[in-house]
Curated annotation (Swiss-Prot):
Disruption phenotype: Shorter 3' nucleotide extensions of mitochondrial mRNAs and reduced accumulation of several chloroplast rRNA species. Germinates only on sucrose-containing media, with white cotyledons and pale green rosette leaves. Its EC number is 3.1.13.1. This is Ribonuclease II, chloroplastic/mitochondrial. It is found in: Mitochondrion; Plastid, Chloroplast. It comes from Arabidopsis thaliana. One of its GO terms (cellular component) is plasma membrane. The keyword Nucleotidyltransferase does not apply. PANTHER family: RIBONUCLEASE, RIBONUCLEASE II, CHLOROPLASTIC_MITOCHONDRIAL.
Amino acid sequence: MMSVRAINGCSIIRTATSAGGPPVSLFRHRIQRLRASHLREFSKLRLNFPLIRADRRFLGNSDAPSCSTCIHSLVESVSEELESISRRKGSRMRVRASVKVKLTSYGEVLEDKLVNQELEAGLLLEFKKDADRVLLAVLHRRDGKKNWMVFDQNGVSCSIKPQQITYIVPNVYNFDHTGLTDFLQRAQDNLDPQLLEFAWMELLEKNKPVTPEELAEMIYGRADPLESYCAHFLLSQDEIYFSILESKGSRSIYSPRPTEQVEELLRRQRVKEAEDKEFQEFIQLLKSAKKAPSHAKPPKSSWLADDKVQDRIGSLEAYAIDAWASTDQQKLAGTILKSMGLQKTSVSALNLLIDIGYFPVHVNLELLKLNLPTHHSEAITEAAEALLSESSDIDAVRRIDLTHLKVYAIDVDEADELDDALSATRLQDGRIKIWIHVADPARYVTPGSKVDREARRRGTSVFLPTATYPMFPEKLAMEGMSLRQGENCNAVSVSVVLRSDGCITEYSVDNSIIRPTYMLTYESASELLHLNLEEEAELKLLSEAAFIRSQWRREQGAVDTTTLETRIKVVNPEDPEPLINLYVENQADLAMRLVFEMMILCGEVVATFGSQHNIPLPYRGQPQSNIDVSAFAHLPEGPVRSSSIVKVMRAAEMNFRCPVRHGVLGIPGYVQFTSPIRRYMDLTAHYQIKAFLRGGDNFPFSAGELEGIAASVNMQSKVVRKLSNTGLRYWVIEFLRRQEKGKKYTALVLRFVKDRIASLLLVEVGFQATAWVSEGKQVGDEIEVRVEEAHPRDDLILFKEVI
């Protein structure tokens, strides 16, 4: 037998010349480096163990050669011997994992080695503090029948259970707990993971198990308390070379793993080390991006260029909106947050993504949570473009030419696509004839087509302060479907003749061609009406018709619900401080009332037309509340009265076979028809009406099919409506946050919620909020308030009355 011994800090390995040892290449490769992964495992003890230094001398023998010299000599000797064995044998022999079988001949010895020491005060031991930590401690006194009080290495006194004890350091009695720090320091100086590898090679050849004390004798030359503990620590933290063969209480016996298993574990370790290195590089990238000024942060695209980086960022994104796809994704995000020194919360993930520049400061979290489509796929876009270039107008021969009419399209100034426009003339008998021209998307799209299915899936266009996500691909909507000023446009025109009292006397629905004359905003239309220009007599006629229609509806029991409405447009929303344009629209404004009345008139005519011809349509109705609205007559007309009335209104109802009275609007039936580019249910009404106009009753949808479509679309519309309201509220709060501190706002008291807490309407902002108001204030009173706190991300705004 060849025997080489290095004492205290180097190693002792007895290598037999018998066959069956590990391959020479494995030994040569392993002997030359210390594995960083093992040192990371030792960090669980909260220690940083240094590598064995080359200039270190053996304790107790100052004339002995250095550790590095011994190891070098050991490498040469053992390598030469193993090469000689390899040549003689001609091939490597495998070591069979039959340790347990061979142990049966000395089972009694095994049992003896597993005998646990009696617990008593003064013993030095290791115990498991939690899932990630083991600590050294000294037994102090009993705590109840089974537990013990200990002083741990951090100077903390605590109670432990016997099951927590992982090792009792042998031959140590009455240990002074103040010496724990010194013991740990000496253990730190004595640990060398490479020694474990040498021992594995010798024990594998002998197919022999080992206890910590026996390993200490092998690698340190003695089994004193310090060396025994170091050997235990090396074995207990090792995941490569040894596995537990038997265990009882705090005693364990270890067995060397087979060569093939060790090689596989080492391979996995190398993979893990590479992954850990890559992960740490990613963490460093996050830290660098976080520290960088806003103008120097990496663009969002840079985080998506690499698949692994994209996956990690994706896990944080999912964590931020509480929508992880798997527990693995959740754990990955948690690991990233922990590595960044952050709490494992959705808020931490969100703030991190904002800090690195991946998310803008004002990212719309609700939009991300809902996962609504914000772009059309390439397939849908291509299909839409094909419709523009290839589709023919099957209604061309049936279209009436209305290009001679003056046509007004009135909408908000940032409207992308225009669904409707208006015309009017006075007949010779004095009656007013009105045309409501509606865009004709069914000229291009047919039920069940690819583009139609996508529109149905979306249900509606999404209008947010920061962006618009159209139901149809933009090019098709803008260039094909939308009404465009000065161009011939396909439309479905609803014409109505009104009596002087506002009642409908004649009506028709036709496919048409129109040429829009004016594209007006509500503000410009109102200005033209106030100017009362002779050359805009048609606009004046429309306003007159709107007035008499409003009067007629009131006589039929209609309820006025006009109020103030906020509209916000954010310019450059990706900027940390984007420009916020806020508009307050009064629904009682002349132009807004005009458009509102004409849309209701169109809906009534379509419902009547559908009823007359038995056309299945999405008829909408709303039963009036059984509360007499005259009970609110004492309240100021406008937002205050409307707010109280709306509170008692019942929900809308739908019927798909015949009209339902719409009590709030004061009309016998109603069908939403004027926004087919923006709302899918309006489009279904177009499909049905146009099928009838083509000369038959072969409708695309039965009443039952319409009901099914409506259920799905209405659900989607509710989601979009909530998203729009949430986005609007966020930006109103952000707008108010930026205003001068202490600025006063006029507010109307709408109602009292509880005691003196009132629901308010801020007149200058068109925003509803709650605040405590002073004694004596009544519903309808005007008060002044100021903003106390405004946090849009937390959906928090607090107002205080200025007294």
